[in-house]
Curated annotation (Swiss-Prot):
Keywords: Cell inner membrane, Cell membrane, Membrane, Protein transport, Translocation, Transmembrane, Transmembrane helix, Transport
Regions that span the bilayer: 30-50
A Pfam family matched in the record: YajC
Cell compartments where the protein resides: Cell inner membrane
Signal peptide positions (record): none
Membrane topology listed for this record: Single-pass membrane protein
Name of this protein: Sec translocon accessory complex subunit YajC
Functional note: The SecYEG-SecDF-YajC-YidC holo-translocon (HTL) protein secretase/insertase is a supercomplex required for protein secretion, insertion of proteins into membranes, and assembly of membrane protein complexes. While the SecYEG complex is essential for assembly of a number of proteins and complexes, the SecDF-YajC-YidC subcomplex facilitates these functions.
Natural source organism: Chlamydia pneumoniae
Zinc in keyword set: no
Length: 117
């Protein structure tokens, strides 16, 4: 069984140069097709992945900068009301206590008409 596997493997290895020579003879424009595929991939990543994420990030950053006392926010799954805003942190009222949270940890700013319980 092992000898059959080794024989098949050696046969495939010995025939690889034949496939390579045949491919080189068939295609003369080897630069155009990969360049087009690369351009399509770059456009896909830009318009489908990177650009929408950049827009969401800018919108959330603007909302974080516009935070005001009394806004309801979620930070790491905790829902609280903004009590005080500092340079890099926010003080949240949660139940009967206060918690200091980094502005970057705020994941969502709830609108007054949101009913999330």
């Amino acid at each position: 069984m092992l000898s059959r596997i080794v024989t098949c493997f050696l046969f495939l290895l010995s025939s690889l140069p034949l496939f390579a020579e045949e491919e080189a003879a068939q295609s003369k424009n080897t630069f155009v097709q990969p360049a087009v595929m690369l351009a399509i991939a770059i456009l896909f990543f830009y318009f489908i992945l990177w650009r929408p994420e950049q827009k969401r990030r800018k919108a959330m950053e603007k909302r974080k900068n516009d935070l005001a006392k009394g806004d309801k926010v979620t930070a790491m799954g905790i829902i609280g009301t903004v009590d005080d805003i500092r340079e890099h942190t926010v003080i949240l009222n949660i139940a009967s206590g206060k918690v200091e949270v980094l502005k970057g940890a705020i994941s969502e700013i709830l609108k007054p008409n949101d009913n999330k319980s």
